[in-house]
Every structure is written in structure tokens, then in C-alpha cells.
């Protein structure tokens, strides 16, 4: 696959080895101390530590929060917010699927403006820009890295709350490695010009797709 970038309106970088550009993204944000938010599975796989090592090698401090569960709760946001405040970090890196993305965006609000994320439920209640955030999706999931939403589970009401704000459009992100975002465009009828563009950019023979998993593992090693 040939690396490429497009702006919608966030800057999105796509391509094998893009994770190595994380320090470059952070420097453009003026960041020097990262809070890396992810889940336990990617920590066990070594992906979290690899991302952290890139930042450390560039002279940046890194704190890690990996207690994000599927369908993350208000309590998880509160814990991650406290971890961010205690760390002294000045930007957030979200790594994983939709759950870490939603938590990171919520922390970007509560760590800056205070209160509980429940106070921002609904539309346009976030008063300004959130804490600088780099999102690194590893799944073909909700697309939280490019949306104006954060969805958090409120167990006290047995309810999923949604925070909508144009301020969630992140300062930067690095869209890395995972071909699952693009593979569907090999077979589906393109609904939009962007789909056709992505399908054309995915220069990978269909007969070789069986080896994709092994290829992805090598890219992380």
C-alpha cells in the first residue's frame, strides 16, 4: 500500500510504519509529556509499549492508562482524568478501537474544564477546544477518531450517554497499519468517491490476502 494523507478536516496519515511518526505529530502539537490511553489487550501485545518507546526515544515523557474496557463507563473516564491530572501530561494519545478513543475525548474535556462527563451530555456543551489529542485507531470500528461524538456508559442510569461537540475534532491523528479499514473497498460497490479513492490506493493483490495477518504482525515487530 502506498502511504497517503487526506484532510477531513483532521490530518490523517495512512501507511505501514506510520506509528514511527508519532513523535513528529506530538511535536507539531507542542507536546512534551503524553498520557497514552488504551486497553489491556494492546498492552499485552506490546503495541502500547512500542508507541511509548517512540515518544521516549524522542525525549518525551510518557504515562500510560490501559484500564479501558469495552463500552467504557463514567467511572473509567473519572479514573483516566485523575491519572492525566496527576501525570502532568500536556497531550493525550489514544490507541486502540472506539473505546479508548471515546475515553480519551472525554478526558480531553473533563481534565481541562472539570466536572463529570455526564455534565456535558448532549450537544455543544463543551465550552472550547479539548486537550490536544492524537488518535491511533487499530480496528475498523466506530470511527471515533474522526467524529464529533464520545459515547460513555452511565451504569447509574443503565444508559449510554453521548457528548457531541465540534471541539472533538482532534488536533491530529495517525491512522496506522490496520488494513481492515480498507479491505472492504476491494469488494464493495463504492458509495462515494472517497471509497473509490481508497480502493485504488490499496495496492495489494487479492490472492495474497490470506497472508495479511502474518504481514501485519511483522509490521509491529
Language-model regions, residue ranges each:
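Predominant activation on well-ordered alpha-helical scaffold segments within soluble catalytic domains
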Residues: 23, 49-52, 63, 78-81, ...
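Thr-Gly-centered strand-to-loop micro-motif
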Residues: 38, 136, 182-183
Amino acid at each position: 500500500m502506498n502511504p497517503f494523507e487526506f484532510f477531513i478536516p483532521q490530518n490523517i496519515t495512512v501507511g505501514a510504519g506510520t506509528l514511527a511518526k508519532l513523535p513528529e505529530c506530538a511535536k507539531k502539537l507542542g507536546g512534551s509529556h503524553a498520557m497514552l490511553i488504551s486497553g489491556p489487550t494492546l498492552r499485552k501485545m506490546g503495541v502500547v509499549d512500542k508507541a511509548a518507546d517512540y515518544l521516549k526515544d524522542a525525549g518525551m515523557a510518557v504515562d500510560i492508562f490501559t484500564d479501558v474496557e469495552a463500552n467504557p463507563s463514567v467511572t473509567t473516564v473519572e479514573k483516566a482524568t485523575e491519572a492525566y491530572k496527576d501525570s502532568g501530561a500536556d497531550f493525550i494519545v489514544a490507541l486502540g478501537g472506539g473505546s479508548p478513543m471515546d475515553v480519551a475525548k472525554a478526558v480531553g474535556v473533563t481534565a481541562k474544564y472539570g466536572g463529570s462527563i455526564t455534565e456535558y451530555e448532549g450537544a455543544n456543551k463543551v465550552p472550547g477546544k479539548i486537550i490536544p489529542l492524537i488518535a491511533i485507531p487499530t480496528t475498523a470500528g466506530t470511527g471515533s477518531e474522526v467524529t464529533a461524538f464520545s459515547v460513555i456508559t452511565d451504569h447509574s442510569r443503565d444508559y449510554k450517554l453521548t457528548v457531541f461537540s465540534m471541539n472533538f475534532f482532534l488536533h491530529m491523528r495517525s491512522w496506522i497499519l490496520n488494513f481492515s479499514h480498507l479491505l472492504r473497498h476491494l469488494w464493495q460497490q463504492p458509495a462515494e468517491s472517497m471509497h473509490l479513492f481508497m480502493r485504488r490506493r490499496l495496492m495489494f493483490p487479492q490472492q495474497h490476502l490470506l497472508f495479511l495477518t502474518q504481514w501485519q504482525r511483522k509490521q509491529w515487530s
